[in-house]
Amino acid sequence: MKYDHQSIEIKWQRTWEESGAFHCDHHSDKPKYYVLEMFPYPSGNIHMGHVRNYSIGDVVARFKRMQGFNVLHPMGWDAFGLPAENAAIKHGTHPAKWTFSNIDNMRTQLRRLGYSYDWRRELATCTPEYYRWEQQFFLRFFEKGLVYRKQAPQNWCPKCHTVLANEQVIEGLCWRCDSAVEQKNLTQWFLRITDYAEELLADLDKLEAGWPERVVSMQRNWIGKSIGAEIVFPLEGPGGSGNDDSITVFTTRQDTVFGATFMSLAPEHPLVEQLIDGKPEAPAVRAFVERIRNMDRIVRQSDDLEKEGVFTGAYCVNPFTGRRMPIWVANFVLAEYGTGAVMAVPAHDQRDFEFARKYDLPMQVVIQPEGDALDTAAMQAAWTEAGLLVNSGEFDGLPNEAAKQKIADSLETSGKGRRTVNYRLRDWNISRQRYWGAPIPVVYCDACGVVAEKDENLPVLLPLEVRTHEDGRSPLPDTPEFAECACPKCGGKARRETDTMDTFVESSWYFARYTSASKDDGAFDPAALKYWMPVDQYIGGVEHAILHLLYSRFFVKALRDCGYMDLDEPFANLLTQGMVLKEGAKMSKSKGNVVDPTEMIARYGADTVRLFCLFAAPPERDFDWSDSGIEGSYRFIGRIWRLAEELSGVLLPVKACSATAADAATPQGKDLRNKEHATVRKAGADISDRFQFNTAIAAVMELVNALYLAKDELSGDEGGRKVLSSAVATVLTLLSPITPHIAEELWASIGNAGRITDEPWPQWSEEALARDEETIVVQINGKLRGRVSVPAGADAKAIEAAALSEPNVARHLEDVTVRKVVVIPGKLVNVVVG
């Protein structure tokens, strides 16, 4: 009978769905296992990256279920955001209609791949049933002081018509549309992620065992902890006298403060306008600031950047030396790092050195190597190594590391500064000036000011009866039914906040909502949340290392502190899968190299597509899609089908690894049983310990080869039939997490009761792996000429002697010259003749 993948796969998908095969709840005595792939944005169609990601997750889910775990494996939709809104505008439809139509299509595609999701837990973040709880979180954060509103320069995407968080600006471009990001002063809502900077950093130690080192390192660098000091530099007032105004700098090199000869400010520093007010330098400074503010942040931090600046006409005073220090605005100083002001020490900082050389600014050596003296006139680069302090008053002669502590002590006792810790991490701007997002539950009242909504008024519904603007501007400010409201505090006229929340807010807690997705009287069922969380295995792309993963970690900690959960980290283990490439490049419509999963499923079947995605490479590595590769996977599935057909009158309905030593009485039986148990051991270890699905599949392929070699010799007696049946059952059981449909079909066709989905993972035995003898393949010039049995562990000489005396081999060696004999113990002998 021909392998009809279409009807077979649909039949079993329907069977699983109707029987609730993958339903789970938290009322179980089994150990729990929560496996989750990052949920998709409903773009309309799944792509091969989705297939690989979700196939990896499905193997893990099915494997853990076979190991006896109570497995939670849900799916949902990251449904708010710019892409849906922009696509809907482009196609002349409403974002809601566009989104839900895409969800329906993608759900059908995912079902067609046979993934073991508990679809009862499906959620979409754009529904009021979901975002009402997000609005409630906002209110709790507001009460706790974790959310606040301020005006500040923001990253503005002119194409998307919205602000971007720092993490959403990639090399100066919008992460969504690649437009150049501009700076714009706006009043926005922020979450105080910086309140958790130290905990976010410290808890990375807990994740090192289960997360890729690369991701942990990326988060450490993004949080960017620096231990140093703040130093206050008084501003020089009119006539050279000091006044109460000052510039505070953060530095990790307080040991160099005696060498600070000028001050560098970021173009965005709030003091710039004050310093240049009424000065002749003002026009040049303003022009410079305008030009630099929109430069790429990454470029501005580059060592290769040409250092540029402009003098403000103002001065400050070095609090240790009394030196009059000119204040410059420099392109390499960033407002978001430290205080946005840098004490310039050109003799000991390379950027300052280049800047000072360019603008002929003074240098002062304050650290030099022991036994040597540095001359600023002769220096070709800054001295940035360790050394002894000079020209540093009472600290002269101290090693610079020791001087750091002494000078920090002096700062604090003199009131000139203080020890402090600085973080690169900045608070999370969650305001977005677009329509398709969760409304921020705040109103503005002339009498009461900024007022948070009441819980009983949630959800603040996103109105669906609006007309979106073609240029992407939000229609909410122009929708009176939404924007005009009553003040929750005084009942008077008020106006709603018309910004919506960053969609990364939705994805920062969805994993917890899955534990009780249908609960309508609270965000979470406490018992279910406690049982299922944290996620045991999270799977997704490394591109989310900072944005989504860092935000989710913060959100869990903030929700914990608001009493929603007793949890520190959301994801115990993380797997970052590689990309699926075509012809060495990322698949994209513009490149014309997209492989459509729907087309591949129709042609080859879901099992084949799954198999190829899992076999092509280890999961963390990229792999190149190839037609020959998927053809090879299709042939392998066909080979299993034919094997079952050829043995249809021979196979018995038995469990995997059920053949006994007595059944395997012949050498061929012993070899096959040994191979069966060795395969179970290897496949189990490869999947469980390393997620090396490709090598597990390769091991099963070897077992199939062994079955083809042994089937004729073992089909004739009862013991041989049991050995064959056990090995075939093992092949199907090992493949059931990978190619579940054909495994179910053949399992049933053999006459087994129940579904293979419900079978336990096979157990190998030491007894079956122990061998008295082993079979050695004998080749002459690479061609198979015979097999010999030798005692297990025989040495190379004994194996060679047995091979050369094998009758068929000996006959082929008559009248030829043996050049070389290659012996691979336990496997083969190759005789080279010529």
Swiss-Prot record:
NCBIfam families in the record: leuS_bact (TIGR00396)
Native species: Nitratidesulfovibrio vulgaris (strain DSM 19637 / Miyazaki F)
Leader sequence segment: none
GO MF entry, a single one: ATP binding
Similarity comment: Belongs to the class-I aminoacyl-tRNA synthetase family.
Protein's recorded name: Leucine--tRNA ligase
Annotated positions binding ATP: K589
Motif window: 'KMSKS' region: 586-590
CDD domains tied to this protein: Anticodon_Ia_Leu_BEm (cd07958), LeuRS_core (cd00812)
EC primary class: ligase
Keyword Nucleotide-binding tagged: yes
Motif ('HIGH' region): 40-50
UniProt KW keywords: Aminoacyl-tRNA synthetase, ATP-binding, Cytoplasm, Ligase, Nucleotide-binding, Protein biosynthesis
One matching Pfam family: tRNA-synt_1g
PANTHER family xref list: LEUCINE--TRNA LIGASE, MITOCHONDRIAL, LEUCYL-TRNA SYNTHETASE
Gene: leuS
GO CC field: cytosol
Classification via HAMAP family: Leu_tRNA_synth_B
GO terms of biological process kind: leucyl-tRNA aminoacylation
InterPro entries given in the database record: aa-tRNA-synth_I_CS, aa-tRNA-synth_Ia, Leu-tRNA-ligase, Leu_tRNA-synth_edit, M/V/L/I-tRNA-synth_anticd-bd, Methionyl/Leucyl_tRNA_Synth, Rossmann-like_a/b/a_fold, tRNAsynth_Ia_anticodon-bd
Reaction(s) catalysed (UniProt annotation): tRNA(Leu) + L-leucine + ATP = L-leucyl-tRNA(Leu) + AMP + diphosphate
Lineage of the organism: Bacteria, Pseudomonadati, Thermodesulfobacteriota, Desulfovibrionia, Desulfovibrionales
